[in-house]
Amino acid sequence: MKRCKHLIAALGCALLVMPSWANPHRLDDSLSHTVPPNVEMQWLPLKSGQSFAGGMEAWVRVNVRIDTRNWVGRSGRIYMVLPRDQASNIEAVWTTQGRLQAGRLVSGERALVFVGTVPGTTLEDQMQVRLRSNADWSSNSRRLDFHFELEID
């Protein structure tokens, strides 16, 4: 019984000291935009053994502009997030000009794009993004709801 009380006390302390990821702050990236503004997915050739073989692919440039004015001088991590939706999974792979980190994520995931002290009121970069989907892509138009989250240290 005494052991059980210690376990309950330890769990209670763990809940009080929850990591910062438990409450990420969504950042305003409403000034970000894609070039071109609308992208059409293209069919990939059928090649057995390759992921997304026979699926769809598109390339887009994203001019990223994140409002960080409330966090200037604070240390933390910024993640790019792609929520899962009801349609087929999307894989996004990107390179950057250097302010943000290159990376990869799939629907329902988030990926680290910045670590350190927030340098100014905006965080800007340009991403070259490859989007891929399986052949079950079923829509002529679909809005992808990428966004950015900040976790403060």
Segments (PLM) and residue ranges:
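Hydrophobic transmembrane signal anchors and adjacent membrane-proximal interface regions, especially
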Residues: 7, 29, 41, 57-58, ...
